Amino acid sequence: MYKFALIGCDIGYTSSPVVHEAVSGELGIDISFEVCDIGASGLEAAVTKLFDTVDGIFVTKPYKNDIKRYLDKVNTRSGVNVVRCADKSGFNTDGIGFLYALDRAFDDWRSKVRGVLVLGSGGAARSVAEALADTGKSVYVLNRDMVTAAKMCRAFGIEQYYNQPAELIVNCTSAGSDGEDILKALCVSPEFEYAYDLIYYADTPFMQRTAAAGAKVSDGKAMLVYQAIEGEKLLTGVKADTLDVFERAFAKLDGKF
């Protein structure tokens, strides 16, 4: 049996246990899955303990960048969302999971989209921005903290947003889960052709307003499943077709998150 844990702060909403149960079943492996909801002051102690007690750690907000200081090797420029405890190595499966999800939600986006606006500059935003930049799209970043946005732009060779043309908008912030309108907060028009919200557990104002303005929209459920599949494959060495595993696991999860 493989032992996994999820580490984050204020994550009582998480559907990760049920998602990983479905994914592991389709991969043919037995797992246990522990949720560690901890404050920043307890991060080091929690990570140190988990290194000795589990095989892999899945990392969520707000620790995808902070986790790096406890690792011996980091295999990504983006935020770390998967840690292999045996050698204290960090990886990112958010980026590939996001692209899988985007392809599933909008089958024509690769030919129709030239510019993308990414909201946020945390670990998830960095993963999304890097993945999009690697596809050759023009990526623009908008965040309340201009300093962190500027650092992110320098890291990935992308630009801060000053109303450049963009067909796709991606919300990588947690704003909206509590009813906050991130578009209003950042003074952004909702008029885009495509809108993707990484939030999967709430019908956000971001989703509502972009849909009302005519956009094709999607929430983050598929991305959560895709990144979990890639993470479990990485940690266990199991070889499997991600798209095939996704369809079976996602069908199992219908209505559960």
Predicted regions and their residues:
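Phosphate-coordination loops involved in phosphoryl transfer and adenosine-cofactor binding
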Residues: 1, 112-115, 192
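Phosphate/diphosphate ligand-binding glycine-rich loop within oxidoreductases
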Residues: 1-108, 202
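Glycine-rich adenosine-cofactor-binding loop
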Residues: 8, 90-95, 102, 109-136, ...
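Short, charged/polar "capping" segments at the starts of alpha-helices
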Residues: 66-67, 145-151, 202-206
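Conserved S-adenosyl-L-methionine
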Residues: 134-138, 213-216
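Rossmann-like adenosine-cofactor binding region
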Residues: 154-218
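Rossmann-fold NAD(P)-binding glycine/threonine-rich loop
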Residues: 194-248
